[in-house]
Amino acid sequence: MALAPELSRQTKLKEVAGIPLQAPTVDNWSQIQTFKAKPDDLLICTYPKSGTTWIQEIVDMIEQNGDVEKCQRTIIQHRHPFIEWARPPQPSGVDKANAMPAPRILRTHLPTQLLPPSFWTNNCKFLYVARNAKDCMVSYYHFYRMSQVLPDPGTWNEYFETFINGKVSWGSWFDHVKGWWEIRDRYQILFLFYEDMKRDPKREIQKVMQFMGKNLDEEVVDKIVLETSFEKMKENPMTNRSTVPKSVLDQSISPFMRKGTVGDWKNHFTVAQNDRFDEIYKQKMGGTSLNFCMEL
């Protein structure tokens, strides 16, 4: 599949209300903002590289009552429409969501202020997963390297500056996570931490199950824990993005499912970068009650 010139590696991000986004998304913004959510929609919300595919597979396994075969019905990106996704002439995320029967499970990377207003007015359920900023930064760097529809990230040192300044696609990690955290009690939001999911997947999966209004036997929950492990998902063609053309995601540069660990940032950050990041983190996150685990 050849990429149109405007989707070449040199693609520049555009902005909506100061938030950098991929150009086709911005060009399709009016359709995204007027999207009509339904009261029984469940929206999976994450900052990029925070366990989106993982939580999607968990939610789908719960929805399908642990039936692995049903979860193999199609690739994961087709099961839960990505509402801000746009790649003309293909159907947009909104088009795919509109064609889906209720109840719908959808996904987004949008910060709270850019979410289509109908999600709030319909009091939808939101499932948010947050990952510590350092690991998120590293994982996003490798994704930027292999993604052929994002700008070239440059060197790690260059990308470090881009990330801390919020100039990556979907904007600042700090603002994104804080935004969702601050409204968690005002709406139907289940706020989970990637690190908790790694530490005790069964407990966190049970939280998701209860949030979805499902009641599955313990043996089914144990099966879901096994089937949604990183090792299983990395080998699963329905979740590992191996079907995505190399012209979009070049997994010879870096695999889509790379490590899935906590603390990999220590293999990338210099001492000086870590000290600087900690200082910036204190400034930006000092006023919140958010606490992240940086290593297990």
UniProtKB/Swiss-Prot annotation:
Its main location: cytoplasm. The keyword Phosphoprotein applies. GO terms for biological process: sulfation. Highly expressed in kidney and at lower levels in stomach and liver. More specifically found in the epithelia of proximal tubules of the kidney, of the bile duct, of the gastric mucosa, and in hepatocytes. It is found in: Cytoplasm; Lysosome; Mitochondrion. 3'-phosphoadenylyl sulfate binds at residues 49-54, 131, 139, 194, 228-233, 256-260. It catalyses: a phenol + 3'-phosphoadenylyl sulfate = an aryl sulfate + adenosine 3',5'-bisphosphate + H(+); cholesterol + 3'-phosphoadenylyl sulfate = cholesterol sulfate + adenosine 3',5'-bisphosphate + H(+). Induction: Down-regulated in kidney but not in stomach following feeding with 2-amino-4,5-diphenylthiazole. Belongs to the sulfotransferase 1 family. Sulfotransferase that utilizes 3'-phospho-5'-adenylyl sulfate (PAPS) to catalyze the sulfate conjugation of phenolic compounds. Does not transfer sulfate to steroids, dopamine, acetaminophen, or alpha-naphthol. Except in mitochondria, where it can add sulfate to cholesterol producing cholesterol sulfate, which alters mitochondrial membrane organization, and impacts protein complex mobility increasing state-III respiration, thereby modulating mitochondrial respiration. This is Sulfotransferase 1C2. The lineage of its organism: Eukaryota, Metazoa, Chordata, Craniata, Vertebrata.
